[in-house]
């Protein structure tokens, strides 16, 4: 039993700040301003100038993807493309995987105000496939080694830019699916454990994982579901199946469905392909729905008693639908 004494921010309906919180066996058993005698024997932690707050919840995370990226190279702190390229150059010799994965690139936070190109990536990583995903998770840049693997499959898809190596829309999803499925299941489970510990260390206590990112037979959905049941660090995990095929979720007895990818309605602002009625970056940025509108309303109505989430990027939040057979 442990007693925390100090500023306890409850975030309850009255927004109370209490003096004591008692934790026993990873459960909160008391919160208040006076410490009951039955808890007096517990060990005390005086917070001093610190405060104790409830854990954060992440309502939309692609956990398998996050676990994969977390195990790779994070370039989000780079201030220039030159710095990104140097980070990759230093990382490649230490990477034992068959593919180099980098995450967090943004043209908005580097001095050049543009993405690195395929040719620049080739200069620092010519011998291994390299997949660098944008901070928004909906655009990537690939080097020639990776492009050559999928070129025949993706060159006619919307969003394909073979000259620069930048992939958007359906071309991006094709590369993302390939990269996801290239990670061995055993390695993915290990990466998931490291990712869960990392989230917990940052104060995140609950995640809604939207799953289904390209694994054969949607193996990542099953692995996340099994992984969630075995978590021992207190992290709560709710799995949403990213699909418009309700039967896939029902066969796995999953009560939740929706997210991005197969359930995405449109693109996102970060990649300037969100579907709006008026242009917002260039005369051609009206974009369009990725999923035909004829599909998603019926899918949302079908699973009576389930929770559906369809992702509309401009809203920056999920549309939570709780059908009741109407």
Protein language model regions, located:
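Divalent metal-binding segments
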Residues: 2-4, 9, 13-24, 28-233, ...
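Short amphipathic
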Residues: 3, 256-261
